[in-house]
C-alpha cells in the first residue's frame, strides 16, 4: 500500500549523514521523511566516541555555520575538549572532543523530534521506486510505499554488510544490527559503478579491569573549547581524562604469529581499508621498525564502564584480541566486553554524482556518507547536509548548490570525490585544501553563514548572532586603526615593555598587533588600547585578520586567478571526440568522468594543462564559453 501523504524528500538512514540531511531539508520548509531501521540508534557513534580532529573539525564548523546539528550535539555531549595543533598557525588548528555516546545520541534525537516539517518512521527500506530514470519513492520491509520528489541514500556500512572476526564472518550492518541486502541488490540493478570497502573497530574494554594508576593521563584544555558558533562552555557536561598506554614487542609478536588467522591477510576480506586508520595488524606489518604504538584509552561515557582503545582496531580472532589487550601496560587483567571486528560493505563510485551529490543517471536520487567511499562521522555529516539541502531545492524546482574548493572544506571533499573518485575510504585532512589560510575553523561562519541564510538553512537567532559578531569585528578594527601611540607619549613606556624593539615612530593598534610578539589580549591590556571585546569569537577574528592580512590578500588573488577558468562550464552532453587536438587518453578520461567545469577537468589524472588550453580554445570557437556565477 501507499502511505496516504506524499513527501518532498525522503532520507534513508539515520546516521550522521542521514540526520544532517533530514534536518537540512526540513529547515528549508520541505516535508521530509526520515526512514530508519531503528529509531533508538539515530545519531549512533558506531566506532570511536569522538568528533573533530585535523580537517574533520573544520567540516564540523562548516556544518554548524550552515545551521547543522553536529557541533551543537557535541557541545552537549562532549566530555573532553582539546585544540589540536594549538602551537601552529590558525589554518591548521582543529577542535576535537571525546563524546558520551548516550548524551550524543540523545542530543541528536531531541533535535530531530523537535524539528518542524520532519517525520521519523521506523522500517528498513528494501526498494526504490524508479520511473523513467527518476526516483519517485521508497518501499519498506513490510511493503509500505512512500512517494517523494527526491530521495537521499545515507545507509553507511549496511549495504550487503559482512562482519569479520578472525576467519568467521556473518552478515551485519554493524555489530548488533542487520545488513541491508535487498536494497543493495536493488541498487546494483541501477546503472551505477559499485565497489567494496572495509573498515574496522577495536574491542571495547571494561574500565573496572584496567589499572589506570600506572598510565599517563591526558586532560582536556582549559578554558574549554566550544564547537558551535552558537555554543558556550557552560553547555558541556562533566569533563574526564583519557589515558595512554602502548603496544610493545610482546604485542607485536602475538600479532605476527597469528597473521594466518587474520581475514585481511588470509585474503578473506576483498574490500580496501582506510589508509589513515589502519588496523593494529596493518600497523605492525607496515611499520616493522616501530617497537611500540601509542594507544589512547578513551571513555565511552559518564555512565558507562566501556573504554575505547583508540589504535588497536582489529579483525583477529577473539582469543588473539585478548592476548593483544593483556600484553599492554595497565591492561594485564583487562576484560573485553565487545570484540573488535572488520566490516565489508558496498559503496558507489562518487564520480557518478554531480557536485550536488545527485546521481548523474537517476534524477532526484542523492548519495551521502560512507556509501560515497568516505570514512568518518564528520565527512558523512557534511555530505548529508549538502545532499539534504540539494534534495530540498530539487523538490522545490530550484537550482542545486555546491561550494567551491576555495569556499569550504566541504567543497574540497565533494570535488575530490566527484572528480577523482576514491579506491579507499576517504578521510579529510587540511593538506587536501589548496587554500588552507582562507579555510580556517575560526572563519567558517564568515565564509558560509550568509550563504546558509540565502538557502534557508540559517534561523533568525543564528543570523542575528552572526551579524552582531560582524559588527563587533568591524567596530573593533576601526577602533584599533584610529587609536595611535607616539614614542614621546606618556603611554609609550607601558607599550615598549611588551615589544622586542621600542617604538621608533607613531603606531596604531593594528600596527602593534601585526608584531609577532603582540597578541590581542596583551594589546588590549595596555591603557591606550583598552578595553578588550567581550565577544571572544570577534576578538579572535580581529587578531587573525590583522596578523595575516597580507597573506590572506595574496591567497585571495590566487583564488581569483584560478576561478576564471575554474568556473568555465562544460556541457554535460559534450562528446570530447569532437574536440580536435586532444589525445585519445584525454578524450577517454573526459568522456568517462564527464566533468562539470574546466576546474574539475584539470584535476583529472592525465588531463594536461595543454589539453585544458585546447578545450578552452575549442569552447570559445564554438561560442560555448560560459562561466557559472
Swiss-Prot record:
NAD(+) binds at residues 273-287. Keywords: Cytoplasm, FAD, Flavoprotein, NAD, tRNA processing. GO terms for cellular component: cytosol. One of its GO terms (molecular function) is flavin adenine dinucleotide binding. FAD binds at residues 13-18, 125, 180, 370. The keyword Cytoplasm applies. Its main location: cytoplasm. One of its GO terms (biological process) is tRNA methylation. It is found in: Cytoplasm. Its cofactor is FAD. It comes from the Bacteria. Gene3D superfamilies: FAD/NAD(P)-binding domain, GidA associated domain, C-terminal subdomain, tRNA uridine 5-carboxymethylaminomethyl modification enzyme MnmG/GidA. Belongs to the MnmG family. NAD-binding protein involved in the addition of a carboxymethylaminomethyl (cmnm) group at the wobble position (U34) of certain tRNAs, forming tRNA-cmnm(5)s(2)U34. PANTHER family: GLUCOSE INHIBITED DIVISION PROTEIN A, PROTEIN MTO1 HOMOLOG, MITOCHONDRIAL. Homodimer. Heterotetramer of two MnmE and two MnmG subunits. This is tRNA uridine 5-carboxymethylaminomethyl modification enzyme MnmG. It comes from Escherichia coli O127:H6 (strain E2348/69 / EPEC).
